[in-house]
Amino acid sequence: MKMLEQNPQYLYFFSLFLVTIFLYKWLTLKKTPLKNLPPSPPQYPIIGNLHQIGPDPQASLRDLAQKYGPLMFLKFGTVPVLVVSSADAAREALKTHDLVFADRPYSSVANKIFYNGKDMVFARYTEYWRQVKSICVTQLLSNKRVNSFHYVREEEVDLLVQNLENSHSKVANLTELLIEVTGNVVCRVSVGSGDKVDSYKILILEIMDMLGYSRSIEDFFPLLGWVDWLTGLRGKVAEAAKGVDTFLEGVLKEHLSTTGSKYNDFVSILLEIQEADAGSSMDNECIKSLIWDMLGAGTETISTALEWTLAALIKNPDAMFKLQNEVREIGKGKSKISEADLVKMNYLQAVMKESMRLYFTAPLLVPREARQDIKFMGYDISSGTQVLINAWAIARDPLLWDKPEEFRPERFLNSPIDYKGFHYEFLPFGAGRRGCPGIQFAMCINELVVANLVHKFNFELPDGKRLEDLDMTAASGITLRKKSPLLVVARPHV
């Protein structure tokens, strides 16, 4: 596993404390009847199956599933883990038994960043979480609210196009430009101003890296939590949490000190809810946690999805040609594509789906946890078992998809399969109670950016590079970013 490869001192610490852990396990061992568990690869003492998880966990788990089946039982240190790698098993977990698997496991990093679990993404399944989720769905991310911010998206996309035009057909770093346009939209919608993007952009990347699965020893070995202090992780997390709080406190104070209706953003909406219902759960820490959810998840996942989509189109000129024909035909005589035009673009929607299928930004859905003992597909699953849905593996399953490793948007034309959580072979936003409520928010940005870029420009690789030279390797992490930046030459279409 990446943490063991990069930090071999962990194994040293493990060996020093073998006696402690064995004593702990002996003292806490209960005489229980043997359970009918799903198939499991061989485990090592203490670390369980951690040694079998490489730097790309989704690929390692897919390879194990090909040998042991779509339901596997693993041990990550002291933590029992159920790995789901088929659409049928995902449907059982996320629909039939959604409530049982609605909890989140403890994450030491998320707990520190999000004020002891006050956000929506990582919070435990409680009445507090249900209230917060309801507020996000009905007040922040409803269709009406998302549509009300159309002018923000259109203004920022106009600026993106201008920046590319100003490159005068020289090499442009499309990765940076996509992060900028996404960050500006998310920041303006969340806190009222795009000027604050630089204040949190670096923090987001640092925190996303620390939230990556397997970063914290404490999460898998509670008795060895102090190792995170020795390795410096706790210090980094504390510093990041302080940076987040300083930034968000400044945003709150700025809003509270402003009279009138200067702001029309998520912070203002949450402050209004707080003022209207003094007995609600909407305290300042809740507001800050929710805003950081929006800033972090929104900026990182949307910009990453955009980068993969444009890289895939450049890599596959036939798909690019078809998309440009559609967009330019619908946009004929127009200087830009509006959101009203997007609903007419069937091939664009197929391209977006195919990009999300082949290049999952979050290949492993955020882990869930069983709230009670359950008989699941004939197996005994105990309360407290983590549940990992390998959505990346499901979306590349050759039993479900024809030639799954190929970029073929046509597979989604005249297909009922979408990304809203009802088709379990395709789960880019998850499903069930814990599914992402920001689907429309994300897709409005994605489609508008891609449509306008392919409408206005023809893209080439710089320095005479060939299409096969375009690196489509992913960097490991909680989100799968492109390993190398997307450098292009954007020539205006005439």
Swiss-Prot record:
The membrane spanning regions, by residue number, are 12-29
Q: What GO terms are given for molecular function? A: heme binding; iron ion binding; oxidoreductase activity, acting on paired donors, with incorporation or reduction of molecular oxygen, NAD(P)H as one donor, and incorporation of one atom of oxygen; psoralen synthase (NADPH) activity
Q: Which reaction does it catalyse?
A: (7S)-marmesin + reduced [NADPH--hemoprotein reductase] + O2 = psoralen + acetone + oxidized [NADPH--hemoprotein reductase] + 2 H2O + H(+)
Recorded GO cellular component terms are: endoplasmic reticulum membrane; intracellular membrane-bounded organelle
What membrane topology does the UniProt entry give? Single-pass membrane protein
- Keyword Heme present in the record's keywords: the answer is yes
Practical use:
Psoralen possesses photocarcinogen properties. It intercalates in double-stranded DNA and cross-links pyrimidine bases under UV-A irradiation. Psoralen is widely used in combination with UV-A radiation to treat a variety of skin disorders like psoriasis or eczema.
Activity regulation: the record says: Inhibited by columbianetin.
Q: What keywords tag this UniProt record? A: Endoplasmic reticulum, Heme, Iron, Membrane, Metal-binding, Microsome, Monooxygenase, Oxidoreductase, Transmembrane, Transmembrane helix
Positions that bind heme: C436
State the Gene Ontology BP annotations. Answer: response to molecule of fungal origin
Please tell me which top-level EC class this enzyme sits in.
oxidoreductase
Relate the protein's function as given in its record: Involved in linear furanocumarin (psoralen) biosynthesis. Converts marmesin to psoralen.
Q: Which family does it belong to?
A: Belongs to the cytochrome P450 family.
Q: What is this protein called?
A: Psoralen synthase
- State the organism named in the record: Ammi majus
Designated gene of the protein:
CYP71AJ1
